[in-house]
């Protein structure tokens, strides 16, 4: 999966998919009542990016729904996976549950069209703080209470704070997520700084072991050719990037052409890939 980074205005969906992304990452900020408010990153953000692009969440979700609904004039069939980078820093461990519940209701209304022919993308809830695991609990409750538990088949989970893998597993279990139940594990840092692949390799080992908790591993945020090759050599499943075309170019190189291909909608992002 080539995961376009910081896609926070609707027009950027086309921009990143045109460059080769089959997945996007969108930042979600919350108001004082734990309601998702804007798709917005703010400063600081990645080098060579403008940090202030934004939409109201409802506007963004409407655009995203159209981009992932077959038959819509804005439909992009390549776009199969969306990561919501949930900026829960202003929530507490007690309001995280409420935030999750409200976000679940909002996705149901605006993205899934009330459960009636809405967007088809798979969605990862990416949470920066292990203490906010109740966001997941609240989100799941919202869909169950609305009679749309079936939509949880489209939802995956990630903790993005580069925490200890054992602690991450514990937080997922506390949220009611079983091992390998739609679990993506991220690792990374802003593109302004280099970061080694030690934890990525640990996560890949966990993914490939008989008793791990991870289905997929992704690395963020890179666009240098050498970094992309190193990440692919570490056997990641996804790369988050500001320059999707760089990842496309590397995937077309002789060393990688036969080992990797771009994921399509038919590739289940919750299934661990076995070579």
From Swiss-Prot:
It catalyses: an N-(acyl)-sphingosylphosphocholine = an N-(acyl)-sphingosyl-1,3-cyclic phosphate + choline; an N-(acyl)-sphingosylphosphoethanolamine = an N-(acyl)-sphingosyl-1,3-cyclic phosphate + ethanolamine; a 1-acyl-sn-glycero-3-phosphocholine = a 1-acyl-sn-glycero-2,3-cyclic phosphate + choline; a 1-acyl-sn-glycero-3-phosphoethanolamine = a 1-acyl-sn-glycero-2,3-cyclic phosphate + ethanolamine. Its EC number is 4.6.1.-. Its cofactor is Mg(2+). GO terms for biological process: killing of cells of another organism; lipid catabolic process. Mg(2+) binds at residues 25, 27, 85. The active site is at residues 5, 41. Disulfide bonds join 45-51, 47-192. InterPro entries: PLC-like_Pdiesterase_TIM-brl (IPR017946). One of its GO terms (cellular component) is extracellular region. The keyword Lipid metabolism applies. It is found in: Secreted. Its main location: secreted. The keyword 4Fe-4S does not apply. Keywords: Cytolysis, Dermonecrotic toxin, Disulfide bond, Hemolysis, Lipid degradation, Lipid metabolism, Lyase, Magnesium, Metal-binding, Secreted, Toxin. Expressed by the venom gland. It is an enzyme of class 4 (lyase). Gene3D superfamilies: Phosphatidylinositol (PI) phosphodiesterase (3.20.20.190). GO terms for molecular function: lyase activity; metal ion binding; phosphoric diester hydrolase activity; toxin activity. Binds 1 Mg(2+) ion per subunit. Belongs to the arthropod phospholipase D family. Class II subfamily. Dermonecrotic toxins cleave the phosphodiester linkage between the phosphate and headgroup of certain phospholipids (sphingolipid and lysolipid substrates), forming an alcohol (often choline) and a cyclic phosphate. This toxin acts on sphingomyelin (SM). It may also act on ceramide phosphoethanolamine (CPE), lysophosphatidylcholine (LPC) and lysophosphatidylethanolamine (LPE), but not on lysophosphatidylserine (LPS), and lysophosphatidylglycerol (LPG). It acts by transphosphatidylation, releasing exclusively cyclic phosphate products as second products. This is Dermonecrotic toxin LhSicTox-alphaIV2. It comes from Loxosceles hirsuta.
